[in-house]
Amino acid sequence: MRRAPSLVLFFLVALCGRGNCRVANAEEKLMDDLLNKTRYNNLIRPATSSSQLISIKLQLSLAQLISVNEREQIMTTNVWLKQEWTDYRLTWNSSRYEGVNILRIPAKRIWLPDIVLYNNADGTYEVSVYTNLIVRSNGSVLWLPPAIYKSACKIEVKYFPFDQQNCTLKFRSWTYDHTEIDMVLMTPTASMDDFTPSGEWDIVALPGRRTVNPQDPSYVDVTYDFIIKRKPLFYTINLIIPCVLTTLLAILVFYLPSDCGEKMTLCISVLLALTFFLLLISKIVPPTSLDVPLIGKYLMFTMVLVTFSIVTSVCVLNVHHRSPSTHTMAPWVKRCFLHKLPTFLFMKRPGPDSSPARAFPPSKSCVTKPEATATSTSPSNFYGNSMYFVNPASAASKSPAGSTPVAIPRDFWLRSSGRFRQDVQEALEGVSFIAQHMKNDDEDQSVVEDWKYVAMVVDRLFLWVFMFVCVLGTVGLFLPPLFQTHAASEGPYAAQRD
């Protein structure tokens, strides 16, 4: 009694195994019947007549956009090329083969339309793996081979790094023309059901088109347009922002005082930094003379501005260090740069009242040409007063209130007049020389300060001009790529989308 369940289980397993064996035997028999060498030749096109067209349906499934090499102009993709056609020699009655409706056959054993990538860039025209084909009892053949294609892609560098590229995959039969096979699209666009997003590119569209040549009836191909848009974050952080910050340093050149002596050093340092970025760009984009990339245009624009800042800095330093002994300030320079322009540039020059005045001790004596009379009669009054006058008129006008002008005795004046006149004359000449020298120094210093202020006004003028041109140029260069539109390339012949 204990062996009864075991016997039942053994009987069921044997029955199932026998059923599977029958199905396997049916598939093996079907394979032998279909691919019998006397019945099937995989080199012959499956057509009932020489004029019959074999319709090949195609659909591209994008699995991954691996890379786009801008310098070598190559796009690498991982795709599945779905192909479907009908082979009348691969039909059977499923009831005669245990109900088998689907058969998987190795690709090398039946006829293939030998569709290859025409615009490949590495010499690999065919698919990577020849997978099995799915054949149905009605003769329909489905083949879904995977492939990694490296296709030639013409890179448009005009808006780099805000560019949008249109790369194509062109498929065509290598040995059959349009008089023998016809290539049609399953769907208007490529499939992205199993697509893995790229970190550098966004897929905008994947339209497909069937291209025929009216002048050549034997020509037909299927082309897929890969319209891809670059994600600019990487280049914005690593190229554009450093370039903009370097340009801001060039603006600070005009705000730097001329006395510090570092204006030219800063200008040349900024110019060298921009040259480094320009060399870095040349290693990324393709070496083409058809167009200049957007970031290259911006760098060239900034380098021109920095060169302009170097020239203006030389002019400003030349004006700043001018003196009355080397240059004469023209009236129009005074009128333009000292009176009119500062108002428009929001500049205000400190007035003479704001500068510290020179402190001179008050004069307690006023000496004029000696005359015969004076204002004192007694030695005590003469030596006791804080001031005395040689000229009687001065004595009358300058005597303090309550004091009585007195006259110096004539004999005293006559005795000391010779020596006194000589000393006074020498003193007057010395004082006059010192006063004239100080006056000349003040005038020269005033002219020097005027030249320095002119240099400051010129610096401020170029600062506003540089800022305006820099902002306008930056917006004018980087704004148009945000509104660019790209259409799929139609190719040299008329295209029909099925």
Curated annotation (Swiss-Prot):
CDD domains: LGIC_TM_nAChR (cd19064). The chain crosses the membrane at residues 240-255, 262-277, 297-321, 455-478. Keywords: Cell membrane, Disulfide bond, Glycoprotein, Ion channel, Ion transport, Ligand-gated ion channel, Membrane, Receptor, Signal, Synapse, Transmembrane, Transmembrane helix, Transport. Residues 1-21 form the signal peptide. Residues 22-239, 278-296, 479-498 are extracellular. Residues 256-261, 322-454 are cytoplasmic. This is Neuronal acetylcholine receptor subunit beta-4. The lineage of its organism: Eukaryota, Metazoa, Chordata, Craniata, Vertebrata. The gene is CHRNB4.
